[in-house]
Amino acid sequence: MVRYVDLITDAVQSGRKDDAAQSPASAIPESFFSRAAQAPAVKEPDSDRDVYLALWKQMQSIKAGIREKTGFDILPLKEQVRAIAGSPDLLDRLYHYTTRFGNEEDYTASHSINTMIYALKIALRLEYAPEDLEALGLAALLHDVGMFAVPDSILLKPEPLSPGEAEAVRRHPEAGRDTLAPWSGEMPWLAQTAFEHHELEDGSGYPRGIRGEQISEFAKIVGLASTYEAMTHDRPHRRCVSVRELIDTKNRSFSPRVMRAFLEQISLYPLGSLVRLNNRTLGRVVRTHAGQPLRPVVQIMEDADGNRVAEDRTVNLLGNPILWVTGA
């Protein structure tokens, strides 16, 4: 039987072999930052939740602009992304909101925000420069704008899609590229990331089936972050599913370098997920540790006999080597 710890070890080791110095595919023009700095000041949010909800409202506004063909402005997003990318502490706090948002029926806006949060955490592990973090964050927020043009009758359908409906969804990378084309002169990585985020390392992705170094690293990061987000949240047609296949070393869909950073920065067990420990207790993941994807902090909910635990009891697996997760 293959153990999670073996899969993790193999994935991390293969990532190190691919860790030659790499940088984002697109150079970031100075004008991107100078214009953002001249933008009107954004009102300071009252809480981390307000930061998340402000982004959610912006994404809903962009969605409305696309559907109503009235256009949209990405300048406010630049400022919001800059604030988040420039504060690892804020990013970590927002990370905890990814479990609270993303399961609602209309998930498109929260999917984009959660993907940005995961992508930035991956890029921090890869030691991206501040300007590259900002550029990646904006690309991640806008990576799925092509989906905004897909009718809700398809997006929110609880049954399997018809071939025609599935094809409409499958065309969203091209739609995203075309939607972001007006910014290609100043920010070419936006359209590129939207177009490539479903391409896979082994060439099995779409729309072009390109592979390896043909795919920009922004798209590789966003693609993995987007996949993880979708797998760990409910959708109209299914419940959230296991993420084990993401780290299976037989799955060569994702860049080893990016996968390694993902595993070192984001726990195998998502925040809020239920896990069974080797002492047969059941708990919920309430905190994770960078670089320790198998050792989260768990709030115990049921004892070994299945009885609810009344008191607030948490176990930090990082400091308890005799305890480990046996199932999730």
Q: Which residues fall in each region the model found?
A:
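Histidine- and acidic-residue-rich, metal-dependent catalytic cores
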Residues: S47-A328
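Membrane-cytosol interface segments
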Residues: M1-L75
